[in-house]
């Protein structure tokens, strides 16, 4: 029997939390900001604030509609389409990020694939050496090598990469 959409959502959110918690451990000794691509309801942003107290967390969002307690201040919110806000964002954030998280999936899988194919290369200059990149869509091993997922996360549910120089 196929999982219901609710079950699929729960699996994805549990995977997201497990990956974020693992990423927090992996970057604990590194300096730099956190990037959140897509604010949505603000749940992940809120979790990132818990994981990284005192760190700058920059959020990229087209249409802010999150819970009021989960909206970053204007200095940390890059409002607009990713294609307008992500390229050149390094000037605004001031330093490469140690963690980049993208929750970019939608019901339109062809749009998601196109966005992920574009996004992977554009994120390279925003990632510090050794940064962790997480996404609910595959960004491509040609951009960064895959990082092992937490043992309770099924392959294909979430994607984790490490920013290293590729030959």
Predicted feature locations:
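Class I SAM-dependent methyltransferase core
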Residues: 36
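S-adenosyl-L-methionine
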Residues: 63-94
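A generic alpha-to-beta junction signature in SAM-dependent methyltransferases
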Residues: 28, 93-94, 126-127
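C-terminal substrate-binding/active-site "lid" region of AdoMet-derived donor-dependent transferases
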Residues: 106-167
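Class I SAM-dependent methyltransferase Rossmann-like catalytic core
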Residues: 1-33
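Conserved SAM-binding motif I beta-strand of class I
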Residues: 55-61
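Glycine-rich SAM-binding Motif I of class I
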Residues: 42-46
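Short SAM/SAH-binding signature in class I
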Residues: 95-105
């Amino acid at each position: 029997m196929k999982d219901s959409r609710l079950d699929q959502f729960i699996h994805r959110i549990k995977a997201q939390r497990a990956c974020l918690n693992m990423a927090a451990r992996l970057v604990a000794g590194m300096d730099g900001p956190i990037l959140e691509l897509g604010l949505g309801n603000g749940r992940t942003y809120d979790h990132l604030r818990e994981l990284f107290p005192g760190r700058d967390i920059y959020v990229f969002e087209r249409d802010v509609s999150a819970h009021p307690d989960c909206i970053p201040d204007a200095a940390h919110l890059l409002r607009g389409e990713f294609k307008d806000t992500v390229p050149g964002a390094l000037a605004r954030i001031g330093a490469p990020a140690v963690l980049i998280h993208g929750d970019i999936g939608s019901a339109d899988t062809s749009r998601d694939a196109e966005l992920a194919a574009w996004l992977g290369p554009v994120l390279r200059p925003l990632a510090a050496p050794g940064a962790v990149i997480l996404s609910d869509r595959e960004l491509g091993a040609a951009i960064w090598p895959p990082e092992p997922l937490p043992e309770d996360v099924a392959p294909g549910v979430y994607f984790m990469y490490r920013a290293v120089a590729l030959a």
